[in-house]
Amino acid sequence: MRVGIALSGDVPGAAERVLEAVERADVDVVVYHNVELDADVEEVRAKDPGRALVEDLVEGRLDAAVRGAVSGRCVRELVDALDLPFTGRSTVLEAEGRRVLLAPVGIDEGWEVESLVKLGELAARFHRRLTRREPSVAVVSSGRLEDFGRRSEIDRWLADGELVARLLKERGMEVEHVGILVEEALERDVVLFVNGVLGNLTFRCLSLVAGFRSHGAPVLAALERGVVFVDTSRAQRASGYARALRLAAELAGG
């Protein structure tokens, strides 16, 4: 079992955080980098560590990969290499001892109802894989339902939330549109936002500010193809990278 992770000298503190994560993860890790490393680790030096990481994953030289501390451009390169319709990233957070999925967390994802419904289905399947039980789903939008009419943008997102929840219910899922009430949504297993900006902002508030433990964000569309890639923020702490490495190994069967 070989799991790759990348770091770039362009990201402040990247080497220190990633190397600490490798020590803590208890996983066989290959570090992709473009800096001088003074560490006893398996390493691949490349001009573009993120691209090299994706190439080795797609070509089967790695069992799984974690983005690590490099530009998010490598996620787009994964999408292109696998010809994916979208990434479908879903962050795995710990909330009161439970694994809760947040999706979408890519700022350019989830802006159409059809893609949100597909992402909800992918996230539900992924949660079943993690927990072996049926998930409950909360759809989060832009206000309380009684806030219709206050502003056209709010109305549109509320309407999208209602429609997504209805369509997922028609597919046999346990779903509720909770409006803007994130505090209620976190009591469910899957939290589905009506666009990726809301999802990304919520992830940053919960994980990078409030200290909720993050295990990274698997690219669910790739996982459906049998390819394990866990996205992470380049600002993540070493402990977060270590959890992402362990999740990647778990998903790859290690």
Curated annotation (Swiss-Prot):
Single annotated GO MF: methyltransferase activity
Keyword Electron transport: no
InterPro entries cross-referenced by the UniProt entry: MeTrfase_MtxX_xsu
One GO term (biological process): methylation
Record-listed E.C. numbers: 2.1.1.-
Family annotation (NCBIfam families): methan_mark_4
Family: Belongs to the MtxX family.
Official protein name in the record: Uncharacterized methyltransferase MK0941
Organism: Methanopyrus kandleri (strain AV19 / DSM 6324 / JCM 9639 / NBRC 100938)
